[in-house]
Amino acid sequence: MPPSDEAMIRHFTTHEAAFRKVYEIMSESSEGSFHYPPLSPEEVIILDSTEQSDTSHETNDEQDLPVYGLLKPDRLLLDSLLSEIGCGLVLVDRREWETADSVYVSLVMPYYSHGIVDAGTSKSFVYDPGLESRRNIRITEHGDLNEIYRRTYNDTTLYKPVREGWYIELDHSR
Protein backbone atom coordinates (compact mmCIF):
# COMPACT_ATOMS: atom_id res chain seq x y z
CA MET A 1 0.00 0.00 0.00
CA PRO A 2 1.54 3.34 -1.02
CA PRO A 3 2.05 5.86 1.77
CA SER A 4 -0.70 8.45 2.11
CA ASP A 5 -0.15 11.96 0.81
CA GLU A 6 -0.41 13.20 4.40
CA ALA A 7 2.41 10.87 5.50
CA MET A 8 4.59 11.95 2.57
CA ILE A 9 3.96 15.64 3.24
CA ARG A 10 4.89 15.11 6.91
CA HIS A 11 8.05 13.29 5.79
CA PHE A 12 8.94 16.12 3.40
CA THR A 13 8.35 18.75 6.09
CA THR A 14 10.51 16.83 8.58
CA HIS A 15 13.37 16.48 6.08
CA GLU A 16 12.82 19.62 4.01
CA ALA A 17 16.37 20.91 4.56
CA ALA A 18 17.79 17.63 3.20
CA PHE A 19 15.51 17.73 0.13
CA ARG A 20 16.55 21.31 -0.58
CA LYS A 21 20.24 20.44 -0.15
CA VAL A 22 19.89 17.61 -2.71
CA TYR A 23 18.41 20.14 -5.15
CA GLU A 24 21.17 22.66 -4.39
CA ILE A 25 23.94 20.13 -5.06
CA MET A 26 22.32 18.83 -8.24
CA SER A 27 21.60 22.28 -9.64
CA GLU A 28 24.95 23.87 -8.78
CA SER A 29 27.52 21.07 -8.93
CA SER A 30 26.35 18.48 -11.45
CA GLU A 31 26.35 18.29 -15.24
CA GLY A 32 23.82 16.84 -17.67
CA SER A 33 20.77 14.65 -17.10
CA PHE A 34 21.40 11.41 -15.22
CA HIS A 35 20.50 8.98 -12.44
CA TYR A 36 22.37 9.25 -9.15
CA PRO A 37 23.79 7.04 -7.88
CA PRO A 38 24.83 5.63 -11.27
CA LEU A 39 22.70 2.66 -12.24
CA SER A 40 25.49 0.60 -13.78
CA PRO A 41 29.25 0.28 -13.36
CA GLU A 42 29.71 1.39 -17.00
CA GLU A 43 28.52 4.87 -16.01
CA VAL A 44 31.46 5.36 -13.64
CA ILE A 45 35.12 5.50 -14.64
CA ILE A 46 37.26 3.32 -12.38
CA LEU A 47 41.03 3.50 -12.60
CA ASP A 48 42.83 0.21 -13.18
CA SER A 49 45.61 -0.91 -10.87
CA THR A 50 48.37 0.44 -13.15
CA GLU A 51 46.90 3.93 -13.17
CA GLN A 52 46.30 3.78 -9.43
CA SER A 53 49.92 2.92 -8.74
CA ASP A 54 51.01 5.79 -10.99
CA THR A 55 48.98 8.20 -8.85
CA SER A 56 49.81 6.68 -5.48
CA HIS A 57 51.56 9.89 -4.41
CA GLU A 58 48.25 11.78 -4.72
CA THR A 59 45.67 11.99 -1.97
CA ASN A 60 42.26 10.33 -2.36
CA ASP A 61 40.67 13.68 -3.21
CA GLU A 62 43.25 14.29 -5.97
CA GLN A 63 42.48 10.84 -7.42
CA ASP A 64 38.75 11.53 -7.37
CA LEU A 65 37.18 11.64 -10.80
CA PRO A 66 33.94 13.59 -11.16
CA VAL A 67 30.79 11.58 -11.82
CA TYR A 68 28.36 13.81 -13.73
CA GLY A 69 30.40 16.74 -12.47
CA LEU A 70 30.02 15.64 -8.85
CA LEU A 71 33.22 15.34 -6.84
CA LYS A 72 33.63 12.79 -4.07
CA PRO A 73 32.63 15.14 -1.19
CA ASP A 74 29.36 15.98 -3.00
CA ARG A 75 28.67 12.31 -3.72
CA LEU A 76 29.28 11.36 -0.09
CA LEU A 77 26.94 14.12 1.07
CA LEU A 78 24.31 13.06 -1.49
CA ASP A 79 24.53 9.45 -0.31
CA SER A 80 23.94 10.62 3.25
CA LEU A 81 21.06 12.93 2.27
CA LEU A 82 19.34 10.23 0.18
CA SER A 83 19.59 7.86 3.12
CA GLU A 84 18.08 10.51 5.42
CA ILE A 85 15.12 11.20 3.13
CA GLY A 86 14.51 7.52 2.35
CA CYS A 87 14.98 7.78 -1.42
CA GLY A 88 17.35 5.37 -3.15
CA LEU A 89 18.12 7.55 -6.15
CA VAL A 90 17.57 10.86 -7.89
CA LEU A 91 16.69 11.31 -11.55
CA VAL A 92 18.08 14.65 -12.71
CA ASP A 93 16.71 16.35 -15.82
CA ARG A 94 18.78 19.37 -16.84
CA ARG A 95 17.92 21.64 -19.74
CA GLU A 96 20.19 24.47 -20.79
CA TRP A 97 19.36 27.31 -23.14
CA GLU A 98 22.42 29.11 -24.44
CA THR A 99 20.39 32.03 -25.75
CA ALA A 100 18.84 32.68 -22.36
CA ASP A 101 21.99 31.66 -20.48
CA SER A 102 19.86 29.72 -18.03
CA VAL A 103 19.58 26.20 -16.69
CA TYR A 104 16.38 24.38 -15.77
CA VAL A 105 16.78 21.47 -13.36
CA SER A 106 14.04 19.12 -12.24
CA LEU A 107 14.40 16.15 -9.88
CA VAL A 108 12.44 12.95 -9.30
CA MET A 109 13.21 11.02 -6.11
CA PRO A 110 11.30 7.70 -5.93
CA TYR A 111 10.05 7.08 -2.39
CA TYR A 112 7.73 4.07 -2.83
CA SER A 113 7.57 1.50 -5.61
CA HIS A 114 5.59 -1.70 -6.03
CA GLY A 115 5.34 -3.89 -9.11
CA ILE A 116 7.46 -4.20 -12.22
CA VAL A 117 8.57 -1.69 -14.83
CA ASP A 118 5.53 -2.13 -17.08
CA ALA A 119 2.93 -2.56 -14.35
CA GLY A 120 3.08 -1.04 -10.93
CA THR A 121 2.61 1.92 -8.66
CA SER A 122 5.17 4.41 -7.47
CA LYS A 123 5.13 7.59 -5.40
CA SER A 124 7.95 10.07 -5.68
CA PHE A 125 9.02 13.47 -4.47
CA VAL A 126 9.43 15.80 -7.45
CA TYR A 127 11.04 19.20 -7.77
CA ASP A 128 9.88 20.89 -10.96
CA PRO A 129 9.25 24.65 -10.86
CA GLY A 130 7.62 24.58 -14.31
CA LEU A 131 5.30 21.62 -13.79
CA GLU A 132 2.12 23.69 -13.55
CA SER A 133 2.76 25.29 -16.95
CA ARG A 134 3.02 21.97 -18.79
CA ARG A 135 0.11 20.59 -20.79
CA ASN A 136 -1.55 17.27 -19.95
CA ILE A 137 -0.31 17.31 -16.35
CA ARG A 138 -2.89 16.47 -13.71
CA ILE A 139 -2.33 18.37 -10.47
CA THR A 140 -4.78 18.15 -7.60
CA GLU A 141 -4.79 19.78 -4.19
CA HIS A 142 -7.86 17.89 -2.93
CA GLY A 143 -8.09 14.28 -1.86
CA ASP A 144 -5.43 11.63 -1.43
CA LEU A 145 -3.74 10.58 -4.67
CA ASN A 146 -4.08 6.91 -3.69
CA GLU A 147 -7.87 7.25 -3.39
CA ILE A 148 -8.18 9.19 -6.64
CA TYR A 149 -6.26 6.50 -8.53
CA ARG A 150 -8.27 3.68 -6.87
CA ARG A 151 -11.55 5.24 -8.06
CA THR A 152 -10.43 5.22 -11.69
CA TYR A 153 -7.88 2.38 -11.61
CA ASN A 154 -6.54 3.46 -14.99
CA ASP A 155 -3.00 4.17 -16.04
CA THR A 156 -2.43 7.53 -14.47
CA THR A 157 0.11 10.07 -13.31
CA LEU A 158 -1.08 12.58 -10.73
CA TYR A 159 0.68 15.36 -8.83
CA LYS A 160 -0.06 17.07 -5.54
CA PRO A 161 1.72 20.29 -4.50
CA VAL A 162 3.78 20.14 -1.31
CA ARG A 163 5.73 23.43 -1.32
CA GLU A 164 6.67 25.90 -4.04
CA GLY A 165 8.10 23.77 -6.87
CA TRP A 166 7.86 20.53 -4.85
CA TYR A 167 5.25 17.83 -5.54
CA ILE A 168 4.23 14.30 -4.73
CA GLU A 169 3.89 12.24 -7.91
CA LEU A 170 1.78 9.09 -8.08
CA ASP A 171 2.40 6.99 -11.17
CA HIS A 172 0.36 3.87 -11.87
CA SER A 173 0.40 1.62 -14.91
CA ARG A 174 -1.31 -1.73 -15.48
Language model features by range: what are they?
Residues 1-84:
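N-terminal export/targeting and maturation segments
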Residues 83-174:
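Extracytoplasmic electrostatic interaction patches
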